[in-house]
């Protein structure tokens, strides 16, 4: 049986692992046992990688995704079409859309979505940084690329209202994406079709 100090350290590890998505107490406990019993070297590498990421990874000054410099590779790429800005929930969405090869414009990453059940309101979606991103640019069309979930739809509605009186054409991905589907789990073909067949919300001009 663990003494109290070791028990405290073990419980602290479990508590830390529980912050990961979809990891409950039992899953966290299994992971903790696995790391301590069978994967100590890998656990040390994990700690080192996490500490390095915490020191070096920042938000892109332009699109708000994660990067290690001032600008991410996409924002720094002068060949991208700066007239079209796609607004997504998280960095994984950018990766998936890039893999589908269906958007050659730029992105803005909200780093959150509205979830009233969890107390996540408009402050969760970085509208202030989005407003800064729009200043002085060449943007003509904004593509809302949130998921067709309750949270994604709520976020899309708030974004539509935010853009309503601004001089941009606004569209949203078509509902070829399954209802309740997160972009993270949508195959490349379906995602590309949703981009190409996106639904117009408003024409350009205030």
UniProtKB/Swiss-Prot annotation:
Pfam families: RecR_C, RecR_HhH, RecR_ZnF, Toprim_4. It comes from the Bacteria. A zinc finger (C4-type) spans 60-75. The keyword Cytoplasm does not apply. GO terms for molecular function: DNA binding; zinc ion binding. Keywords: DNA damage, DNA recombination, DNA repair, Metal-binding, Zinc, Zinc-finger. Residues 83-178 form the Toprim domain. PROSITE patterns: RECR, TOPRIM. InterPro entries: DNA_Rcmb_RecR (IPR000093), Rcmb_RecR (IPR023627), Rcmb_RecR_Znf (IPR015967), TOPRIM_dom (IPR006171), TOPRIM_RecR (IPR034137). GO terms for biological process: DNA recombination; DNA repair. Belongs to the RecR family. May play a role in DNA repair. It seems to be involved in an RecBC-independent recombinational process of DNA repair. It may act with RecF and RecO. NCBIfam families: recR. This is Recombination protein RecR. The gene is recR.
């Amino acid at each position: 049986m663990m003494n109290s100090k070791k028990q405290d350290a073990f419980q602290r590890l479990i508590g830390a692992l529980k912050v990961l998505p979809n990891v409950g107490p039992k899953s966290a406990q299994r992971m903790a046992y696995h790391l301590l019993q069978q994967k100590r070297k890998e656990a040390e590498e994990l700690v080192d990688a996490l500490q390095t990421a915490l020191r070096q990874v920042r938000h892109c000054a332009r699109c708000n995704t994660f990067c290690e410099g001032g600008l991410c590779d996409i924002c720094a790429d002068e060949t991208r079409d700066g007239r079209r800005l796609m607004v997504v929930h998280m960095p994984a969405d950018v990766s998936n859309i890039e893999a589908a090869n269906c958007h050659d414009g730029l992105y803005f990453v909200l780093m959150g979505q509205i979830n009233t059940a969890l107390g996540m309101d408009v402050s969760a979606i970085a509208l202030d940084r989005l407003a800064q991103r729009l200043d002085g640019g060449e943007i003509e069309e904004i593509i809302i690329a949130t998921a067709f979930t309750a949270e994604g739809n709520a976020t899309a509605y708030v974004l539509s209202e935010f853009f309503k009186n601004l001089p941009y054409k606004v569209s949203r991905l078509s509902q070829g994406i399954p209802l309740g589907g997160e972009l993270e789990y949508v195959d490349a073909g379906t995602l590309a079709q949703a981009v190409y067949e996106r639904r117009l919300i408003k024409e350009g001009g205030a």
